[in-house]
């Protein structure tokens, strides 16, 4: 071989690497094929859109959890945040007859507060993330149970004084969870948009790369001049924000503010 010419060997195929990267997608495809062969109604447009609609809310929460995992943490409070924003957004319309501004801003503000408190406990006080967010899970659960008095919130519900709730779920809000655009459910469209934006943000922006570097090696990232506390705080705030948005979308979908709606969201989001 001539001097200065190096032989470049192609990378050998690794079954383990292939399964690691594409195993989940392959399993989903296989399951869909099996159900399609056994049930002719499975692979239909209506059924697929129903499946996508059902996982849209979990996807919102899962994206939030992903941000905390990327920086090497774990947010256990997302389920309680879902329940909090579900009952608060419902109460804004049913109890207080508020419009678009309060119905959207108040739940979002509360979810941001939850994220900031989580970040304060984990980043500033340096409480282990599992302990801090577990404590917030119970605190937020207690808050929304006290606020709703343990009752789900719905139109024409009886109040403590014997009267009926004055408000109802507004059409614009229900459209977010039940409406369609060009035969596609609005929650599905919102989910695809959110997934696309999140992918671009994490893969192609400076902040996204900084988040990965922070989670990959915290000390090395700090010595490299990366403001790791800022990015860890950002991750917990985004985790709570997306959980809050998922809770609002859930209320819009079912037309009720269920107090226990977020109970199973954490494990579903982690599995997703």
List the model feature ranges, each with a label.
Residues 129-204, 231-234, 254-262:
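Transmembrane helix-bundle core of multi-pass membrane transporters
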Residues 196-237:
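Membrane-helix/interface signature in polytopic inner-membrane proteins
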Residues 24-37, 64-65, 137-144, 188-200, ...:
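Hydrophobic core segments of alpha-helical transmembrane domains in multi-pass membrane transport
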Residues 40-50, 144-151, 180-181, 201-208, ...:
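Inter-helical junctions in multi-pass inner-membrane proteins, predominant
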Residues 55-64, 80, 84, 116, ...:
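Hydrophobic alpha-helical segments embedded in the membrane of multi-pass proteins
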Residues 97-137:
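Alpha-helical transmembrane segments within multi-pass membrane transporters and channels
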Residues 30-96, 121-126, 252:
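Single transmembrane alpha-helix segments in multi-pass membrane proteins
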Residues 1-23, 43:
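Transmembrane alpha-helical segments of polytopic membrane transport and secretion proteins
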């Amino acid at each position: 071989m001539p001097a200065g010419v190096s032989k470049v060997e192609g990378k050998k195929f690794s079954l383990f690497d292939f399964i690691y990267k594409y195993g989940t997608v392959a399993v989903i495809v296989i399951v869909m094929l099996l159900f399609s062969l056994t049930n002719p109604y499975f692979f239909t447009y209506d059924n697929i859109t129903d499946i996508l609609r059902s996982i849209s809310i979990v996807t919102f929460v899962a994206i939030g959890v992903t941000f905390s995992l990327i920086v090497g943490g774990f947010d256990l409070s997302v389920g309680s945040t879902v329940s909090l924003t579900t009952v608060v957004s419902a109460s804004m319309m049913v109890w207080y007859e508020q419009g678009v501004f309060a119905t959207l801003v108040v739940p979002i503000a509360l979810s941001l507060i939850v994220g900031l408190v989580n970040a304060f406990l984990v980043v500033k006080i340096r409480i282990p993330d599992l302990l801090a967010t577990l404590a917030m899970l119970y605190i937020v659960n207690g808050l929304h149970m006290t606020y709703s008095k343990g009752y789900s919130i719905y139109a024409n519900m009886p109040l403590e004084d014997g009267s009926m709730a004055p408000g109802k779920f507004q059409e614009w809000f229900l459209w977010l969870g039940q409406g369609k655009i060009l035969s596609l459910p609005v929650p599905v469209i919102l989910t695809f948009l959110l997934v696309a934006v999140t992918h671009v943000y994490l893969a192609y922006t400076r902040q996204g790369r900084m988040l990965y570097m922070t989670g990959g090696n915290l000390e090395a990232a700090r010595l490299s001049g990366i403001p790791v506390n800022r990015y860890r705080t950002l991750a917990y705030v985004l985790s709570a924000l997306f959980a809050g948005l998922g809770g609002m979308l859930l209320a819009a979908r079912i037309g009720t503010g269920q107090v226990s709606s977020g109970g199973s969201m954490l494990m579903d989001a982690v599995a997703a």
